[in-house]
Design a protein with these regions (language model features):
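Class I SAM-dependent methyltransferase SAM/SAH-binding core
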Residues: 88-91, 96-142
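A short acidic, Gly/Pro-enriched loop at the edge of an enzyme's catalytic core
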Residues: 141-152
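Short catalytic micro-motifs in class I SAM-dependent methyltransferases
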Residues: 152, 156-160
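Class I SAM-dependent methyltransferase Rossmann-like catalytic core
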Residues: 43, 48-72, 76
């Protein structure tokens, strides 16, 4: 359900790449994520959280202090996606994947879960830890996801761009 950041066409996943019908191609990193942040959306050399920030957040979240919040998010997601046979769920601003991973586990194998974040370090960490989820580096200001492609979009502590969230 990812889209090409150049032309906006739907990307098809191959063995090691995503590509669109117009021939734009994006390699999968060895960790399993794809970089879909258009150069004009970066606004800095390395946007988003750096490696130390990602490590600190992961260590904090793994203490369990936000587990009740995550469980409530999962409960609401399960309730909302119940009518869908194979729900498509997008975590907009997924960070290092804590909520995304727990959400995918709660929803089970019938759900297709995607996550994106502007931080390459965060997405790399997420993709390394949560292998069954499709992760991408991308921006909330130009979400690399198909129009009306998600049955549920979650956004936990990330920038909210109402028009983009409504689009996906």
């Amino acid at each position: 359900m990812f889209i090409c950041p150049v032309c906006g066409d739907l990307l098809q996943r191959g063995e090691r790449t995503y590509s669109c019908p117009k021939g734009h191609s994006y390699d999968l990193a060895k960790e399993g994520y794809v970089y879909l942040l258009a150069p004009n959306k970066k606004h800095s050399k390395d946007p988003g959280d750096n490696k130390q920030m990602v490590s600190a957040r992961r260590a904090f979240l793994e203490t369990g202090l936000y587990q009740p919040f995550s469980e409530e998010l999962n409960r609401l997601a399960l309730q909302y996606t119940e009518p869908f046979e194979s729900p498509v769920v997008l975590d907009a601003g997924c960070g290092e994947g804590y909520y995304t991973g727990r959400l995918a586990e709660a929803l089970g194998e019938h759900a297709r879960v995607f996550g994106f974040d502007i931080s390459k370090c965060a997405v790399r960490a997420a993709a390394k830890k949560y292998r069954g989820i499709a992760f991408a580096v991308g921006s909330s200001f130009g979400i690399p996801f198909a129009e009306a492609g998600a049955d549920l979009v979650v956004n936990v502590f990330a920038p909210i761009v109402p028009g983009e969230l409504a689009r996906v």
